[in-house]
Amino acid sequence: MQDRTHLVDDITGHRRMRRNRKADWTRRLVQENRLTVDDLIWPIFIVPGSGIVDPIAAMPGVNRMSIDKAVEAAREAAGLGIPALATFPNIEMELRDEIGSNSLEASNLINRATAAIKKAVPNIGIITDVALDPFTSHGHDGILRGGEIVNDETVDQVARAAVMQADAGADIIAPSEMMDGRIGAIRMALDAAGHQGVGIMSYATKFASAFYGPYREAISTGGLLKGDKKTYYIDPANGTEAIRDAALDVGEGADMLMVKPGLPYLDICWRMKEAFGLPTFAYQVSGEYTQIKAAAMNGWIDGERAMLETLLSFKRAGCDGVLTYFAVEVAKILAKR
């Protein structure tokens, strides 16, 4: 029989990586990571009033919604199999003050939204944030005194707010304000109030990123912000510091961990999952979303493929799920497969 060995066989030791890529069925058979609807958390923005669906110019396809419309959106999400929503309020300017006192109102916008959604769609998870930026007149995540974000007073306030959010029906508290000691304080406050079953998804590594701009428009804080958030968010250059920060949250009782933003920090996703083994999530933030949308709208990229590829990259990096504004769009695509 004629020897049909090729030079390539000698070079590769008869190992050819393309054999497993030769057909659709083989590619599907050996695929290492898959994106499913179970991986999706949908962030939504809540505004006062009723009957409101207000498009956000900087986030094409994303709307601010009044509570009644948010309930309708929750029904749609549940029908598509999306496990959970993450809710963010855009409250009236006259309710915002230096200390974010409206965060401690039991009947504030976010708590009313939680109660309404849980009543109408009890089988969908509700994840709420206790950061003060939607409630402050200066746009910072904590209490501002003398030009400084005061850590301990802010921790006291967000722990109290967490209990109120749990009282309203929140399933998971996701504190994003990056104050030292907040996870332990929230855990103790929740347990003392009888909310042992309410989880904490820590924004364990939230970076001082350029990718948050459209979000700040969505909650109307961009024009309010005095200075920057570099004294409490993590420097984008610091990976080891990020893991140390996450380790403190794990020790204080975090049930889940989050990396924010997502795509620029896939290395942190991987390191955090490897280090702690806790359920790990990435937040595909507003700037990441808008980049894809804007490029697709201009015909520069295939928007659907880019969307799915970036979401799959989070799974490959070790994430158990993703907070993404694409959630409903992706869920509809996956349902057709």
Where are these regions (language model features)?
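Alpha/beta enzyme core
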Residues: 2-3, 11, 23, 35-41, ...
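Exposed beta-strand/loop interface patches that mediate assembly or binding
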Residues: 13-19
